Amino acid sequence: MNYDYLIVGAGFFGATVAERLAATGKKILIIDRRPHLAGNAYSYTDQETGIEIHQYGSHIFHTESDEVWNYITRFTKFNDYVHTVPTHHEGKLYPMPINLDTINLLYGKNFTAEEAKVFIAEEIKKDIEKYQIEEPKNFEEKGITLIGEKLYQAFIKNYTEKQWGTSAKNLSAEILKRIPVRFDHDNRYFASAKHQGIPKAGYTKIVENMLNSNNIEVRLNTSFKDVESEIEGIKVIYTGPVDELLNYELGVLPYRSLRFEAEWTNDDLGHAVINEADKDISYTRTHDYKYYQIHQPKVLTSKKSYLCKEYPADYEVGKEAYYPVNNADSEALYQKYLNLLQERYPNIILGGRLGAYRYWDMDVAIKNALDLASSILKK
């Protein structure tokens, strides 16, 4: 096949661009260095229990975009799962994001919504005066000004420090735009999502369906370097890290990584995910994937569970880069790489979470891919 485009990376971004271009007759080669499709959303079914295992941690599809929902539902059917995430703190489970129940449980009160609003506002005012915060200088001060010290210390501080691998005082206040606090009993994690659910056939099947075209060739276990000699003169959409593509010539862009420890057990988490807010527990989340399969009662009531603990990890070259560490220095370095890329590879378009150096949810990746494909086809 003579290709019109090479797409590097078969996650949702790459697969969406491939599907859209192929639908107009373009010939596409899409590659991925992993042995599977779907990127970090990759899932597979355990044959004994029927549990759909999310290889790289829980993925819950949610979006406010009708465009994205109408597109993705061409390739799968979703169940009606609505995500809730209790947070474990000092032996108790609290609803998260923070709501009226969280506040009452933590403070041992029985506030009404209006009473809680007044109380939290007073707590914030008192703590701002206590720490003499005029303008928050770091993440910790910003957190205190948003929700008060007690809520911040209980649910935000330690979780954040585990996630980022540093003191909250070393993190920029700019990272923390807002902390949602609901003065009602709504415990939905994605309360603003117009659409959400779990694909009934798993995430990998979505991407398989997207790439099921005579105009698309898929090669797994294949890196960009493996095919570079074959694709001279054609356009490339590259969804990997730009620093790796350019051999780290300007230095390594900062990322965070993850590691997972999983085991089959007869124990039961009781929830799809529980967050761990306390410092003495080094992992941030535990996953019990069977709780996503509300459309399969037999799986949901299985006596076995595949419990997976998620540990944040420092990133180094050779590890998987899961999400970028965005700050002024990293943004400046990324921009330098973009300039160098334009000089070396003017035929390459960057995209996807790693290529764009952005922390994107699945729906945002798909939306950006739809926009890119549309702009390409208009030329």
Residue ranges and their predicted role:
Residues 3-30, 373:
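N-terminal Rossmann-like FAD-binding beta1-loop-alpha1 element of flavoenzymes
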Residues 12-14, 35-37, 49, 101, ...:
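Short, solvent-exposed loop/turn segments at secondary-structure junctions
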Residues 48-123:
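Dinucleotide-binding Rossmann-like beta1-alpha1 core, especially the glycine-rich loop
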Residues 222-340:
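Mid-domain catalytic core of redox enzymes
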Residues 320-379:
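C-terminal catalytic lobe of FAD-dependent flavoproteins
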